[in-house]
Amino acid sequence: MFEKNLNGKFLFVRHGLTEFNKIQNETHSESIEFIGEYSDAVLSQEGIAQAINAQKFINNIKIEKVYCSPLKRALETCLKIFESHPNKDNIIIEVFPLVTEFLNICYDFPNSIEENKKIYNMNSKVKFNWKSFEEIFGEKQNLFFLSYLDNLNEEEYNKFYKIFEEANKNKTMDKAIEELVKYKKENNISTLESYKHIFNRTQEFKKYLKEKHIGSIDDLSQKIIIVTHGGFIKFSTSKSVLNQKAFNDWPKDCCFADNCEFISVNI
């Protein structure tokens, strides 16, 4: 189902290390998960170095297409990885909503898609195309993630939809995210997005890739790169999950990707 190499057609890449990752790895503290300021975290200096180091693998590869998560850490990783690619002027990175992180703690949420678009766009060092977001979500792009919160009941969903609409207007998204994640803990909600939903997202994306690239799927001379997150990669790389009936945890045979590690995934 997956290999840790560059041999396949579809290469999934986890973003570089962030300060959140670093603190979480060192302290193993759950309290950091409820701090709104860590939403949409950027790369640490180590994470930037990891992405730059990945250039030595990418620069020798012919690129057919790049897809990227809308979160800052993935966008920044993408920029750093491709900024010295010999064909970078012809590479257009498609920012794709489906490949965002599994939504559960503050760190998993974006603060402002509008602000991210101001930094990462067609005028950046590497070109970023947000057409998918604009076509699917229109004026609601900043709130796209709300449709993924399937473990909230209807009343809870409507309550937080209003909270996020107001926060979006007042530019206080980090506070709304913090309120949501604390509410989850206080009300014993296992995860905000269900494991079943993230699984369905990965399958929908794989189906999209097959259909979109049907004419070149066997051409291994040009690669399709997906810059995404650990949670998304876990469900994208499991074989056993395809026959799974209950979705209560990560699949046991999934890939736990390191930061800026390339994973060749069978689509």
Task: State the predicted function of each range.
Residues 16, 230-231:
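Active-site metal-binding loops of divalent metal-dependent hydrolases
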Residues 89-109, 129-140:
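A short, structured active-site edge motif that brings together acidic residues
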Residues 39-42, 109-113, 183-186, 215:
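A structure-centric feature marking long, well-folded core domains of fungal metabolic enzymes
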Residues 1-10, 19, 23, 28, ...:
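Acidic, low-complexity terminal tails and accessory targeting/binding regions
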Residues 71, 229-230:
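Conserved alpha/beta-hydrolase "nucleophile elbow" surrounding the catalytic nucleophile
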Residues 121-188, 254-255:
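Extended, charge-rich helix/loop segments that form flexible
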Residues 225-227:
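ATP-dependent carboxylate-activation loops
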Residues 2-91, 95-97, 115-119, 195-202:
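Active-site-proximal alpha-helix that buttresses catalytic centers in soluble enzyme cores
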